[in-house]
């Protein structure tokens, strides 16, 4: 699977989805180390991933169960500082745009968060939530949605994560942001 275009959502520039490179032709497997950081040429550009932002997803992500090692990186454009990149360290063509979510925002009910934490054996105080974001080109510009149904639940102490599918259907797969 290395080097294949596995994720087709063009999301490098949420404001103008047209400026996004085609994932099938973008990125390479170039990697370098720089002061405890991994530098990866990704479809989102050159990404710096520090060792303390490397995460293990023991079950992989939905549809990508064979990939377990990911890193969190910032986008190079400060206009999109609210977004992060979840970059696969095993296949540099595989990357997702994600949006950190404060557990206290109410987008996900506290009872549902507690149920997820109990299921995943994560202390709610150590929980980091990230939503997978999709950008679609529309006639009006870009449509940006986040997946509230299957958020990434990360244990900040152990640096392990799971994509947890919420039991309630009230959480949309495509929540407009």
Language model regions located:
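Short beta-strand-centered segments at strand-helix junctions
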Residues: 108-116
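N-terminal domain-onset segments
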Residues: 13-30
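A short glycine-leucine-enriched loop at secondary-structure breakpoints
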Residues: 120-122
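Acidic, glycine-rich flexible loop segments
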Residues: 117-118, 137
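N-terminal acidic, proline/glycine-rich, low-complexity intrinsically disordered segments
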Residues: 1-18
């Amino acid at each position: 699977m290395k080097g294949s275009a596995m994720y087709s959502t063009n999301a490098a520039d949420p404001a103008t989805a047209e400026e996004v490179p085609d994932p099938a032709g973008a990125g390479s497997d170039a990697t370098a180390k720089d002061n405890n950081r991994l530098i990866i040429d990704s479809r989102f550009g050159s990404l710096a991933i520090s060792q303390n932002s490397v995460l293990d997803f023991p079950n992989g992500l939905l549809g990508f169960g064979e990939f377990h090692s990911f890193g969190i990186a910032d986008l190079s454009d400060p206009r999109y500082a609210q977004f992060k990149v979840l970059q696969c360290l095993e296949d540099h063509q595989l990357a997702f745009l994600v949006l950190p979510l404060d557990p206290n925002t109410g987008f996900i009910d506290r009872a549902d968060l507690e149920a997820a934490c109990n299921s995943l054996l994560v202390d709610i105080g150590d929980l980091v939530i990230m939503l997978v974001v999709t950008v679609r080109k529309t006639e009006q510009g870009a449509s940006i949605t986040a997946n509230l149904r299957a958020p990434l639940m990360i244990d900040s102490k152990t640096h392990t994560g799971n994509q947890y599918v919420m039991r309630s259907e009230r959480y949309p797969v495509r929540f407009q942001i």
